[in-house]
Amino acid sequence: MSRIGNNPITVPEGVSIEISDNKIIVKGKLGEIEQEFSDVSVKMNEGVLNVERVSEAKEHKAKHGLYRSLINNMVIGVSEGWTKELELVGVGYRATAQGQKLELALGFSHSVVMSLAQEVKVETVSEKGANPIIKLTSYDKQLVGQVAAKIRSFRKPEPYKGKGIRFVGEQIRRKAGKQA
């Protein structure tokens, strides 16, 4: 069994942490995130954060690792940020970003327009001869992953030609076409 919960979290400079009864607030140069927790205790001393479980019950062991990972993701997010990159594979597939709106041309009769949350920054890269790339950046790992999954769901990669929206580096399982 993994013992991720036992690993201490080192807090980098420029990140401040406030711990109240069952809530932790992490502030950094990129933003501020808060998270409620239960069945664990969080202690801070000398730039190191420790998450300890209240008992050895199975559900407390599970939450121990969960909350340690969530808090670690928050600390990394407010200090460095999280990035997801999506690649548009297909003829005529384009993406343009205007502020907090992302417009996608995905082969439908209409273009797909998606408005993004304030916390997510979007950037599109289109080079001649290469597939367009959408870069999503935020301090909230869960939010950037959720937005990326929503964009990918507009046109999932299909297994025959591989067309669609995929994460950069994602391997698509390809199928052989029918034998004529």
Predicted features along the sequence, with ranges:
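N-terminal intrinsically disordered, cationic/polar leader segments
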Residues: 2-76, 80-149, 153-180
